[in-house]
């Protein structure tokens, strides 16, 4: 049958799947049917799954199939088996079509036991002008021998979807490209999903690769209402899973979990629409790969992995670096992954004159090293599922590892040292207090947080009272550092917005915190009582850690420096800052300046009296964007600057260097260029600057 030519040449292919089970029995041929054949080199192939979006059958020994016509059928499509690909894996369902012919071609990359694929999510582009990053995707796919590329939705708008279709398809990428329907992909038309389906085909489908069955599900709701219901999708999923051999690994793709609570640790089942699926009865469920939250996240529950990736071209809403993730599935469907931040290029790592350097197994994101009594403590991230999350203690003089203890998930942000204990929090809210001598756990705190609301913020502490503050913006908890007992909990009434990677400001009896798309909150540090909250267009986009001093809050949000009255939350002064300030920095007050990092203007100093820009501290081009929604090129300092004993300003930077500037005029004095981006603050102790980078290197620079 005829189809629009540009769709025929540019449509994404499905690549795929499984060792075919025995073909189904010959379907009844009375009445009206969707009929057709599946061929390989003009020869019939048996056992291929064919569906109309509800009913599923397999081709017979002659490669033929027949599905009873039904009202509401949109497409006739196939589940492309392992070892094959198909340029036209679907056709619009029509009673006028006499025969649907699907032609498979061999695809060795998906023919083995297990496979690799590149996962993308939330690229949110506006047109062809924003496709330059896709070359990096192809490079990663080629290097990792990916069987396919999957984009789990929020391609964004008609122009964005069309640009993806033209620039990222099976021809340009050299392998099948799979697209999922996200909430921002539902655009104006007869139904929210109409445009997506005209460009990419069925919003729900399956395919196979490496002996694994992959199931694609759509977003339940979006910017425009879809015509389908998730109950319809659930009925098809049940029929689809009934076609595969028992024990065959199954991995789901979707823009988000099919049900809000699906990524809990309970693996007895999940829900699509109003219909429950019991893992042990319906399939060998080994993974759900999704997007939507703009975060890097890997959680394993038994044999099942839940994987979320940050956008590939910009920082996530919670300051996750732009990410290209390769997922590897073994023959049993077990998923592991490798992350590259923002680019396919290999970083050129250099020691840069460091007194010592030690590489840790995991990456270091926003976890600032803590130096105490001759020991450097660093927390590591594991968004790849490799088991590298933990806390490591190193000898400050030599860099030798003193002890290393695992955490259940990533230690993405700041730790604290209070009451003789090192205290860390992972992104699922678990808090652990380690004894500095040997890393033994003194106490634990394990909250039950909502599975979508992972914690990206750093821990804060009040050394005077011995309280440690965990949580972010809502459901904050104050814990006694000595005993681990909870002193107070926020009531959790404000469950809005998204997490951000700041650290709460503590001082003068108050604790000030923020949430993206929500606002700023001030609690009584002793009781947890909410003193005030402010939600406005500026404070809805935080990122930086607030500084409390002399009854004022010095805050940075969106594009502004804010001076706020601590008692009332009212803004006293505001200054628009060139380059944007939605980064994980904090204001450094000096005698004449307020100094802080920016997204695009390096380090900026404001005159304390006038708030005029006094100087800008230059840095190189950033290596990986992480500030929310920010894209390259940029000159980003996303860390907290500090004053050296000689009065110079020091900060680590996204350009892969630790920089030093003259405080009076911002003149660049020197740098240690090591090659990997710095998201964590550098610190000074006993004549050395200590810094930890995104490649997991910890270094000591003698200054």
Whereabouts are the PLM-identified features?
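N-terminal export signals
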Residues: 5-25
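Metal-dependent phosphoesterase/phosphodiesterase active-site architecture
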Residues: 29-41, 93-95, 118-121, 239-243, ...
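Repeat-blade elements of multi-bladed beta-propeller folds
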Residues: 363-391, 408-431, 451-476, 490, ...
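Aromatic (tryptophan-biased) beta-strands that constitute blades/sheets of beta-rich domains
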Residues: 346-365, 390, 400-406, 440-451, ...
């Amino acid at each position: 049958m005829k189809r629009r030519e540009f769709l025929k040449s540019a449509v994404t292919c499905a690549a795929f799947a499984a060792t075919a089970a025995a073909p189904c029995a010959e379907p009844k041929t009375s009445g009206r049917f969707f009929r057709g054949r599946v061929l390989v080199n003009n020869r019939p192939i048996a056992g291929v799954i064919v569906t109309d979006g509800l009913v599923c059958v397999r081709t017979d020994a002659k490669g033929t199939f027949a599905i009873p016509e039904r009202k509401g059928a949109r497409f006739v499509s196939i589940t492309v088996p392992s070892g094959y690909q198909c340029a036209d894996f679907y056709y619009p369902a029509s009673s006028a079509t006499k025969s649907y012919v699907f032609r498979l071609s061999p695809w060795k990359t998906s023919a083995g036991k297990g496979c690799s694929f590149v996962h993308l999510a939330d690229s949110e582009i506006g047109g062809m002008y924003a496709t330059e990053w896709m070359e990096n995707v192809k490079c990663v796919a080629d290097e990792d021998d990916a069987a396919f590329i999957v984009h789990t939705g929020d391609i964004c708008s008609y122009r964005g979807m069309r640009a993806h279709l033209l620039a990222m398809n099976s021809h340009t990428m050299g392998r099948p490209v799979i697209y999922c329907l996200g909430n921002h992909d539902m655009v104006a038309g007869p139904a929210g999903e109409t445009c997506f389906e005209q460009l990419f085909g069925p919003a729900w489908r399956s395919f196979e690769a490496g002996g694994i069955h992959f199931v694609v599900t759509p977003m339940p709701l979006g910017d425009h209402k879809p015509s389908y219901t998730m109950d319809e999708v659930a009925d098809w999923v049940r029929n689809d899973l009934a076609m595969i051999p028992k024990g065959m690994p199954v991995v789901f793709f979707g823009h988000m979990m099919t049900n809000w609570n699906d990524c809990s640790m309970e693996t007895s089942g999940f829900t699509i629409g109003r219909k429950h699926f019991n893992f042990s009865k319906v399939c060998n469920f080994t993974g759900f790969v999704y997007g939507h939250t703009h975060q890097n996240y890997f959680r394993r529950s038994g044999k099942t992995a839940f994987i979320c990736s940050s956008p590939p071209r910009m920082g996530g809403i919670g300051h996750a670096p732009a990410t290209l993730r390769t997922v590897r599935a073994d023959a049993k469907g077990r998923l592991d992954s490798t992350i590259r931040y923002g680019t396919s290029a290999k970083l050129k790592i250099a020691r840069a004159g460091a007194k010592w350097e030690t590489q840790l197994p995991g990456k270091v994101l926003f976890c600032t090293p803590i130096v105490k009594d001759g020991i450097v403590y660093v927390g590591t991230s594991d968004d790849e599922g490799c088991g590298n999350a933990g806390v490591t203690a190193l000898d400050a003089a030599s860099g030798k590892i003193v002890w290393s203890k695992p955490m259940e998930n990533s230690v993405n942000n700041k730790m604290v040292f209070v009451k003789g204990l090192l205290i860390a929090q992972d992104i699922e809210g678990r808090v652990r207090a380690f004894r500095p001598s040997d890393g033994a756990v003194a106490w634990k705190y394990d909250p039950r947080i909502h599975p979508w609301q992972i914690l990206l913020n750093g821990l804060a502490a009040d050394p005077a009272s011995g309280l440690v503050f965990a949580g972010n913006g809502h459901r904050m908890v104050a814990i006694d550092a000595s005993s681990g007992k909870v002193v107070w909990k926020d009531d959790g009434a404000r469950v809005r917005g998204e997490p951000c990677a700041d650290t709460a400001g503590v001082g003068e009896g108050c604790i000030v915190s923020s949430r993206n798309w929500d606002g700023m909150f001030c609690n009584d540090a002793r009781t947890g009582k909410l003193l005030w909250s402010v939600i406005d267009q500026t404070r809805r986009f935080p990122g930086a850690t607030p500084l409390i001093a002399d009854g004022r809050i010095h805050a940075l949000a969106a594009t502004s420096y804010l001076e706020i009255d601590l008692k009332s939350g009212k803004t006293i002064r505001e200054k628009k800052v060139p380059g944007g300030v939605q980064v994980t920095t904090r204001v450094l007050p000096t005698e004449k300046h307020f100094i802080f990092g920016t997204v695009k203007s390096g380090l900026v100093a404001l005159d304390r009296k006038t708030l005029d820009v006094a100087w800008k501290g230059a840095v190189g081009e950033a290596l990986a964007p992480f500030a929310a929604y920010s894209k390259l090129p940029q000159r980003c300092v996303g860390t907290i600057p500090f004053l050296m004993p000689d009065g110079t300003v020091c900060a680590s930077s996204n350009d892969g260097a630790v920089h030093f500037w003259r405080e009076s005029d911002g003149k660049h004095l020197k740098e240690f260029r090591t090659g990997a981006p710095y998201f964590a603050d550098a610190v000074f102790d006993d004549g050395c600057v200590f810094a930890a980078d995104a490649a997991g290197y910890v270094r000591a620079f003698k200054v």
